[in-house]
Amino acid sequence: MSDFMKSLSKIAIPVTLQSMLQASFSIIDQIMIGQLGEVNIAAVGLYGNFSLIFSVVIGSVGTVAGILIAQFTGADNEREAWCSLNVSLLCGALLSALFLLAAGGFPAQILQLYTADGRIQQAGAVYFKTVAFAYLPMALSTILSAWLRCKEHAAVPFWASLGAVAANTGLNYLRIFGKLGFAPMGVQGAAIATLVSQLLNSLLILLGFAVCLRRDGSHPQWALHFERITLWAYGGMILPILLSEFLWSLGQNVESAVYGHLGTANLAAYTLTCPIQSLIVGALSGLSAAAGVMVGKQLGKKAFGDAYRDARRIMLTGLVGAIGVASLLVLFAGAYTGLYRVDADVQALGKVLLVVFALYAPVKVENMILSGGILRSGGNTRVIMIIDTIGTWGIGIPLCLLAAYGLQWGIVGVYALLTTEEIFRLAVSLVIFKRRSWMISL
């Protein structure tokens, strides 16, 4: 095995497994809650849509942390790497508090934005109030994981996720259905299981982080002031990502609101496909993380030729992997939707939606690697903001509204049309990649 493949595997495989395990949090909840009927499926799905905003926002903080830590590690500047971690943790704590206040204090108002079904609102409010407390441990896990990957300890977040998923599965079984003497709690039981699992995940990552520091002989530095860059430069990197990711996730919520107004059956069909979509993307997300770390380190060393070469290899690997995974999804889409105790028409709609997703999967994965890893590794995040904003609000949302309210299409047609904006993203990203203007050493 070449040095390139060893480095890629060391980062990509643990990150991929971790992403798939994290996606399984949602799958386990959905399948078990699916035994309780369509209303509860939709309620948990709507929480997932709202939490997507937090996930992408805190993910953007973790992305900037990864960009800086990778480059400063490549440049052998430990102080700046620690400063990057400290500032990112502070940002993560502030964002977590804001989302906790929103989801924990105003769940009914949030749910009314998604659906007019009072049953879904009632079930969703119960779920929101409990799981809202998971935001802080999620932020801690995300940012510490960025450090561990850049320091070649990507296996730590994976093992933490494995323990958390095991806990989530067991607690779901006990609390949702009332096994081994526990009272059945339904959707609230799933919420408790998810919260406890996220707390366990962050605790295990924190312990692993401490062990790795000791093994590496590294000592924490509490600086909050950069020497190589300014806080304004940090803000200049994080704000475009925050804005673009927030607008993208807001767009996802607009799309979900459109799905919700297409009827409960359509919303349930879309919701039951979300976990498997997350799992498929997670199966190849390690390549995006590896691209950010590997290319970022090369840029930190000012080895621009090696950075471009590694980026191309990772893109090719992602394309081959996406085609293979998409083919499997087409074959087993019906088997997956059959796991849910819902009406046959909901299962049929879900199967077709998964096939449409599979057709777009190679484009989605290449966008993930390019936009989420390669192009951002140089720190110029503004161009990604422009691409994402135009793609979501200039193409995706208008097409979604046109298909749903203008053409009166069903869920399959609406989803298929709006997803064409992924093609625009890829075309523009490839042009920027080939021009090499993204290759910047901080």
For every predicted segment, state its role:
Residues 33-52, 119-123, 187-188, 229-237, ...:
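Interfacial/gating helices of multi-pass transporter permease domains
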